[in-house]
Amino acid sequence: MLDPVGCGATAYRTQVAAELAALAPTVIRGNASEILSLSGQVGAASKGVDSSARAEDATSAAATLAQRAGCVVAVTGATDYVCDGANCVSVHSGHALMPLSTALGCSLSAVTAAFAAVRPPKLAAAAALAVFGAAGAVAAQRCQGPGHLPAEICDTLYRMDHATLARHARLS
């Protein structure tokens, strides 16, 4: 599992992320700017760890990166995408508060790694994005702002069931 945090923000981060991607991780998960940068898109840059691009604009880069690295690439945003080089699956879940909370991307990468330990990579990544996004949607209804959202997501993950997932996530 590779989460190229801040790839594109500095030359050093981009270089290290590229070196790690060359080690054939099972899944690479990042925001659109990180995936665009890691795939070698000229002019791709991030604002620190925040994305300056939309996930749907990075699906071609994700597919190319998946082919080159021989892995599954997950791009997160308002809609998430999981690409294996042949095709991409879109995951519709989450909440607008999620990008405003620190460390949720890292938490999602940890959940994705756990799923990938027991299921095939593409299925694992799509399922992790759906479950985490559904947890975010439910948690956001219980919070008044982004500050308590990460803790509420943890609690919601603990309580996650099939009915909640079906109400708050859709794959296409």
Predicted regions and their residues:
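Short beta-strands and strand-loop turn motifs
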Residues: 1-4, 45-47
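Conserved phosphate/ATP/ADP-binding segment of small-molecule kinases
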Residues: 11-88
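Short, well-structured alpha-helical segments that form the helix of a local strand-helix-strand
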Residues: 61-66, 121-136, 153-154
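Short pre-catalytic strand/loop immediately N-terminal to key active-site residues, enriched for Gly-Thr
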Residues: 91-102
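Short, small-residue-enriched loops and turns at beta-alpha junctions
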Residues: 6-10, 81, 98
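Charged C-terminal helix
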Residues: 134-172
